[in-house]
Amino acid sequence: MPFNITSVKTSSNGVWQGDNPLNFAFPLLIVQTALIIAVSRFLAVLFKPLRQPKVIAEIVGGILLGPSALGRNMAYMDRIFPKWSMPILESVASIGLLFFLFLVGLELDLSSIRRSGKRAFGIAVAGITLPFIAGVGVAFVIRNTLYTAADKPGYAEFLVFMGVALSITAFPVLARILAELKLLTTQIGETAMAAAAFNDVAAWILLALAVALAGNGGEGGGEKKSPLVSLWVLLSGAGFVVFMLVVIRPGMKWVAKRGSPENDVVRESYVCLTLAGVMVSGFATDLIGIHSIFGAFVFGLTIPKDGEFGQRLIERIEDFVSGLLLPLYFATSGLKTDVAKIRGAESWGMLGLVVVTACAGKIVGTFVVAVMVKVPAREALTLGFLMNTKGLVELIVLNIGKEKKVLNDETFAILVLMALFTTFITTPTVMAIYKPARGTHRKLKDLSASQDSTKEELRILACLHGPANVSSLISLVESIRTTKILRLKLFVMHLMELTERSSSIIMVQRARKNGLPFVHRYRHGERHSNVIGGFEAYRQLGRVAVRPITAVSPLPTMHEDICHMADTKRVTMIILPFHKRWNADHGHSHHHQDGGGDGNVPENVGHGWRLVNQRVLKNAPCSVAVLVDRGLGSIEAQTLSLDGSNVVERVCVIFFGGPDDRESIELGGRMAEHPAVKVTVIRFLVRETLRSTAVTLRPAPSKGKEKNYAFLTTNVDPEKEKELDEGALEDFKSKWKEMVEYKEKEPNNIIEEILSIGQSKDFDLIVVGRGRIPSAEVAALAERQAEHPELGPIGDVLASSINHIIPSILVVQQHNKAHVEDITVSKIVSESSLSINGDTNV
């Protein structure tokens, strides 16, 4: 049954009345959208282990749905993607493209580009000029090889389109690749992003030129128009840009200021006004004769980058645009791409020529100029491959070229495959040639060792999720800082999850600020973030060097950023926030009369953050402390230090034995040196009944691993451990005997004794070891079902939400130099000596 767009109805009456929904516009659009999203998401999952950007999956998905693969089945094409439906699908996809280019404009900070310096500008110019010139040369060959005399496009427009296609760098895709490789906040990442931003702006200018020239018609037919038309189009486009930046930009600053009240809620009317502005700007440039996406992009540039308005605006629309509408555009591109059009050795030779020219031009141009401005050769080569990234903007150029009949089907398919190949090779190539992207770490000495050798400087890496962690971390760090340590250097790492959302990249730009990691450089008048403001005040009040850093990463690889930073900065201890946090009104003994109540229900920031902590504990190159915050640092519960900072008043250190507990008393000793901190050390002695009956630990069944504690698999010498424990205690007493209260207990029930300490109102903070090489008392708890096994048996008991514990908990793990692996265990009692092994038949 033949169809045309004018005779198609929007919706059907349903199958019960004899209608086929696929013969109606809206039901067919639903089916097309669902199929496109399902295929692109499936491919994204397949490509994820290869660390490829999502755009690769979407481009490949579009090609597979088109005539190159599934489209070879004509029944499928006629039913799912009939010709009459394509204008509808392309119109919906174009709306998504329009708003996505608005988001791209929001990502580009023009003031940041101006501050990027001559180095980035020089690299960008070289990265555009050489491939553009090479592209012009290739264009002559392709025009004379792949075009007939009847369909040859005009020289000018074809040369410009080919030059732009080969010289462009995809700014959003490059940002995503840099983030995946942990390079976004490095020097090379800063240079690449700045150069790509220059490149992006230049590409849009060249694209506007190409569109204006293409509007003049080609040699292959069509109505000839005066060359003055192209000139008028260009002048009108330039006038539009000037008007937007001079008139509209100040207006949008006013809108952003009015639209972001103090309660952080963006007013609906201002959001609607802005979205309408996107549509009007797109219509204006289409009216001029330049593609509508150019207007949306320029309008995005007018939105202020500081403040919350732009960020909130993106959060409102990006999921719908990037997740639903944008894949439709890739699909429409794929439906136009027929790889079968590349026939014969000559055509495949043209594909090879285009790929080699694109790669060589971009890489060589970038490399030469980067070396000239004193970038190391390895980094310069890496920059060349990074700048060779293509993506959505490349497809936009190609689709406009095909729409204007500048590119025929064969040339279009060749250039799409070129874009796909150059982007696909970026990640593996950069990982191969740029060593810092591999994430290797050195192993450092633990805190106890640093007491003897580097007492003049204590380096701490304090991680936080957001403003809620600031006061507790400052309070803890202030308690560790003493007058006897000449210098404390604090690295504050704000952990931010990298998602597929565009706003993640904007967060990175804010953090980077001209390339510096989560920076302490702010433009005049810019508001300090809530996270860093507290630490900046702390730095000014005390003798503490504070260096803010940002880690923007997917949660599965966040631990790599933390461990790498600990390695790079040679820190002695990493402090991690627990994934659960109690309300401050629950937290402290001074004001809380009951451990229960609503405050006893913790706020869970997410299981993903728990996994981050577990991976850091396993891979850290130094000692690690996990802070279970129950109101530590709240004004009501704390005492001011001499410099005005909050400090923990009363600290209890629980000691059973083992390396983690030895690290705990070392930390407790440092706290005792603070004049405002009172430290109590409670040593639990092994009961007489356990001295004659040793405990052997065996691996837990795989089914229950998440509910069992992890201990070290190295063979343990009980006598050696006992000797080390006694030595550590003697050393502790000799240094801090006059500053601490020391107690010894031999409990009948270890859990009851621990809970009595935690439920008392005597302490603000309890410090315990993780207990990976446990004493007999701690090992006896191995059969207990764990709620938080990563904290060890004692830490788990104190962190449990059902035990009504009042103080905050600090669980310490000493860095293990032996590189031994942890293994989850369950407990049995035997007559053998204490051992922890991998034998399941003990």
Curated annotation (Swiss-Prot):
The keyword Transmembrane belongs to this UniProt entry's keyword annotation: yes
Single GO MF annotation: antiporter activity
GO biological process: intracellular potassium ion homeostasis; potassium ion transport; protein targeting to vacuole; proton transmembrane transport; regulation of pH
Pfam family, one: CHX17_2nd
Transmembrane segments annotated in the record for this chain: 26-46, 55-75, 86-106, 122-142, 155-175, 193-213, 228-248, 283-303, 320-340, 353-373, 380-400, 413-433
Disruption phenotype: Impaired light-induced stomatal opening.
InterPro entries associated with the record: Cation/H_exchanger_TM, CPA2_transporter, Na+/solute_symporter_sf
Membrane topology: Multi-pass membrane protein
Entry GO CC: endomembrane system; endoplasmic reticulum; membrane
Region annotation Disordered: where it falls in the sequence: 585-605
Compartmental location: Endomembrane system
Residue ranges the record marks as coiled coil: none
Tissue expression pattern: Expressed in leaves and stems. Preferentially expressed in guards cells.
Keywords of the record: Antiport, Ion transport, Membrane, Potassium, Potassium transport, Transmembrane, Transmembrane helix, Transport
Ranges of Basic and acidic residues composition bias in the record: 585-595
Function description: Operates as a K(+)/H(+) antiporter that maintains K(+) homeostasis in guard cells and could regulate pH. Plays a critical role in osmoregulation through the control of stomates opening.
Family: Belongs to the monovalent cation:proton antiporter 2 (CPA2) transporter (TC 2.A.37) family. CHX (TC 2.A.37.4) subfamily.
Name of the protein: Cation/H(+) antiporter 20
Taxonomic path: Eukaryota, Viridiplantae, Streptophyta, Embryophyta, Tracheophyta
Gene (name only): CHX20
